[in-house]
């Protein structure tokens, strides 16, 4: 007879017989399923509806980042054998799928990113994949938690930037903490979803993903590209808030009307152009 322990050892040996690259691809698949397809629902029909809404709510930058993760893992060392720690991490990620806490998938992502970046420093492709995974975790989980902690100050900073611009171009400006307006007749309150911080973390996700896709090694000039992404997102967001504070009609247009779409596309294209320039040009000249 074969004991459970023997079966367990045979299973581990069988997993170790796989190439390390294949093992880590399966790890990425498990993480992807947790992030995109683990949607609670009471029935299959409800699940499909919730899944469609969930996938549609994700930014294009999220999907670009996942393409980068799988591409970098696929380009990693071909002949390296799987390690016991790889199997343990994969099994831990799969087992974490039974937990219902929303933070669990992000903690699994963070742990996997750290594993790639620390354990695989000699394989620059896997280290780069870890950087993209960390950017995903920062955008989806750690960034919002950080924002909650510093929300008061970050929202005041956004309001101060817009208030200063209004004061320089209009008279009779109303400005108190996070309340700003061009006149007594109209004011807006800067809430969390309007903050530049959310778009900054998304812009940095695009920058990291495209940079790592183009070249796995960082160069010194990359920091300036990242800062350019941050500055552009802040400038565009402040411009939108400025226009929303001018009057009721302007608010409707830029908050829920066509202006909202213009802002979204302008931000997306600007971040893409800057990130692509940094990925394709900066690396050649540094």
What are these regions (language model features)?
Residues 2-286:
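Hydrophobic N-terminal alpha-helices or hydrophobic patches in metabolic proteins across all domains
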């Amino acid at each position: 007879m074969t004991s459970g322990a023997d079966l367990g050892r045979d299973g581990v040996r069988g997993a170790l017989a796989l190439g390390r690259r294949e093992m880590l691809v399966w790890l990425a698949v498990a993480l992807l399923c947790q992030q995109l397809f683990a949607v609670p629902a009471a029935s299959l029909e409800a699940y499909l509806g919730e899944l469609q809404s969930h996938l549609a709510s994700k930014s294009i930058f999220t999907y670009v980042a996942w393409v980068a993760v799988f591409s970098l893992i696929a380009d990693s060392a071909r002949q390296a054998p799987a390690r016991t720690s790889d199997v343990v991490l994969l099994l831990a990620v799969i087992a974490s799928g039974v937990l219902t806490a929303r933070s669990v998938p992000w903690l699994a992502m963070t742990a996997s990113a750290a594993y790639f970046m620390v354990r695989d420093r000699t394989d620059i492709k896997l280290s780069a994949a870890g950087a993209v995974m960390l950017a995903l975790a920062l955008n989806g989980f750690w960034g919002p938690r950080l924002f909650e902690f510093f929300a008061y100050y970050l929202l005041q900073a956004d309001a101060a930037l817009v208030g200063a611009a209004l004061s320089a171009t209009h008279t009779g400006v109303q400005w108190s903490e996070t309340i700003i307006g061009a006149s007594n007749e109209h004011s807006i309150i800067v809430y969390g979803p309007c903050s530049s911080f959310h778009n900054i973390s998304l812009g940095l996700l695009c920058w990291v993903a495209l940079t790592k896709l183009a070249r796995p090694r960082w160069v010194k000039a990359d920091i300036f590209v990242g800062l350019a992404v941050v500055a552009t997102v802040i400038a565009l967001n402040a411009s939108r808030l400025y226009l929303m504070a001018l009057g009721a009609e302007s608010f409707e247009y830029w908050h829920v009307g066509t202006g909202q779409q213009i802002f979204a596309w302008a931000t997306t294209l600007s971040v893409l152009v800057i990130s692509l320039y940094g990925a394709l040009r900066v690396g050649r000249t540094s």
